[in-house]
Amino acid sequence: MRVLLAGGGTAGHIEPALNTADELRMRNPAHDIRALGTSRGLEVRLVPARGYPLDLIPAVPMPRRPNRDLIALPSRLRASVRAVRDVMEQQGTDVVVGFGGYVAMPAYLAARGRVPIVIHEANAKPGLANRVGARFTPYVAQAFPDAIKGAETVGIPLREAIVNLD
């Protein structure tokens, strides 16, 4: 299976993504697992350190108030979606697994109608990308009950070293 992980910017998005990748790889070392990221997120260090390829795409931050960045948003988003589609085509992606953050929205839009999307929301209050992405897929998991209506509550993916603490 060829899996494209989309979650970046902060460790809160990246760690659950990498922990999921580790579990998938443990279950089947033949899985082709790649991650999306931006050049300014923590994923630039964390993803390669865990042994996964990282594909960089343009960041598309959502302006919090009307300004010039809001005018540029549609063209930036289109460019980022195109970059994700290029990665998906190169990899032959079978599924996009998203965890929120700057890279998740373009990934969800690129995958919509092409490959299945699986979303995990680790926060009690979901971010914009996961709220929008959850409309595109029935496969939504959450760490906290009632974060996203209809999502299955599964907790947060943890590293095996943490799970096995005494």
Question: Model segments located where?
Answer:
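Active-site-proximal region of nucleotide-activated glycan assembly enzymes
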Residues: 112-166
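Residue-level detector of alpha-helix initiation sites
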Residues: 10-11, 101-103, 124, 128
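Short helix-capping segments at alpha-helix termini
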Residues: 1, 25-30, 113-114
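Conserved nucleotide-sugar phosphate-binding/catalytic loop shared by glycosyltransferases and other
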Residues: 3-6, 11, 30-85, 154-155
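Short amphipathic alpha-helix
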Residues: 13-25
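Glycosyltransferases and closely related glycan-assembly transferases
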Residues: 83-96, 104-118, 131-136
